[in-house]
Design a protein with these regions (language model features):
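Glycine-biased, small-residue-rich flexible motifs in mid-sequence functional cores and linkers
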Residues: 1-126
Length: 126
């Protein structure tokens, strides 16, 4: 899932990787080509939160290993909870005094991961 139209690569260094994924696997984008083309560069970053929500929608769960207080990863975390997907947060995030979001998301239904069994148990069919 990319945050640009299918014909664009960001960052440019990923052009070959993106072409390989498009040819051999599946490349997904919700970004409208014509609207993207006429927007100033500064506004194009606004498509990345949509990408994060799409990534959440295509999965059973999102695992957060590390994210700062203003990280775009938190957009995907919010989307996962809103979409009824599992949200897993590694225990190390809870032990970081520089961030407050892990406790907030845990109150909203995120699963604190102390070991891999926490993930496997949560993904078992009911």
């Amino acid at each position: 899932v990319i945050g640009t139209p299918l014909g664009e690569s960001y960052p440019k260094e990923n052009i070959e990787l993106q072409a390989h994924i498009a040819k051999e696997h599946l490349l997904v984008s919700q970004v409208p080509v014509l609207r993207y083309a006429v927007q100033p560069f500064q506004h194009k970053r606004h498509y990345f939160p949509e990408r994060n929500a799409t990534m959440s929608a295509l999965t059973e769960g999102t695992i957060i290993v590390e994210a700062g207080e203003t990280s775009g990863t938190l957009t995907q975390a919010r989307a996962a909870l809103y979409q009824g997907r599992k949200l897993f947060i590694l225990d190390s995030c809870f032990n970081n005094p520089a961030i407050t979001w892990p406790a907030r998301f845990e109150k909203e239904g995120a699963i604190r991961v102390r070991d891999s069994e926490d993930i496997w148990k949560a993904l078992e069919p009911a």
